[in-house]
Amino acid sequence: MDNKYITLLQRIIQTPSISGQEDAVCTLLEQWMSVEGIAVRRAGNNLWAECGDGPETVLLNAHIDTVKPSASYTRDPFGGECDGTTIYGLGANDDGGSVIAMLAVFVGLYQKPIPGKRIILTLTAEEENSGRQGIEMLLPEIGKIDYAIVGEPTSLEMAVAERGLMVLDGEAKGKAGHAAREEGVNALYIALDDIQTLRNYEFDKVSPFLGKVKMTTTMIQAGTQHNVVPDTCKFVVDIRSNGLYSNKEIHALLQPLVQSTLTPRSTRLNATSTPIETAIVQRAKALGIPLYGSPTLSNMALLSCPKVKFGPGDSARSHTADEYIHIDEIEQAITLYKQLLQ
């Protein structure tokens, strides 16, 4: 891999790009691509470019935003240090490795396109916060896509399925009263009963790649002082769907089971899967790339075409202190991306 890509990844890390604040890193990449002679377009803090022509359109996507740095960092999260084999810093693994690998492949294809294929590279914002100013801004411009590769740290295994996400805000209503007397209706107890009901609920349908729907209560809040029976209790439920139920179906199943009101923050991030017989998956199998179902959400959820998730790095490093990626992981990804696109 040319040293210019290592330097670019260091510069990306050194340019803070927390979700919703990607302007500077987007400008950095836009200018870099222009210097490389690529005709790049920008919408908001999203970039896209294309090369080649033909009946088949392939989308490459990686995201340029990051989460906020963990307080546990021992290195400078924006340092972009390189020791010769490893690059450290926020976003190195998620998703800088995929950005660099896809860029390197695209630069080569821009100079020598694959006959019969139109390749579109998209570098997009607001993936980490599931915002609406990311890849969704570009899709109407791009048009029909035959298949997509979403670059994420997958240990160079291919995710052919991905869990969806729905967050429910639960609210139990009771009646305030004095805690010293037998009065009032305790909203906290109502919420606890409902949380137990949700905890015990079993979804019947099991996905071969994703397993059962996973449902976890993650937050609860009630009461204002020790001697008042709380009249309201709020809680949050994180639901990871498995593709056999839509988020709307899950909500419709759960609401009648509880007294609390369950309000979805959004139902748009459904689970996704791509049939094994799809050409890109068959190509991966022929190359010996392992297939799996991913528990984590990505831009796959926002694409309606056949899509897979594949890239350098390890998902277990994402959102952790002292994030890093090995240079040879990026180099392997470049080789495999090229082989997948042939």
Predicted regions mapped to residue ranges:
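N-terminal helical capping/dimerization or prosegment-like subdomains
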Residues: M1-P69, T232-V236, I250-L253, I327-L341
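Buried hydrophobic packing segments
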Residues: L29, V99-L109, L138, A191-D194, ...
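A structural signal for short hydrophobic beta-strand segments in well-ordered beta-sheet cores
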Residues: V40, G80-C82, T217-I220
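A generic beta-sheet turn/junction motif
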Residues: R42-G44, C51-D53, R163, G174, ...
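Active-site metal-coordination/substrate-binding segment of hydrolases
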Residues: T57-I120
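Hydrophobic/aromatic beta-strand patches that form the interior of the parallel beta-sheet core
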Residues: V58-L60, T122, I149, V308-F310
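Acidic/histidine-rich catalytic neighborhood of metal-dependent amide-processing enzymes
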Residues: D95-V167, E171
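Metal-dependent amide/peptide-bond hydrolase catalytic core
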Residues: V160, D169-Q342
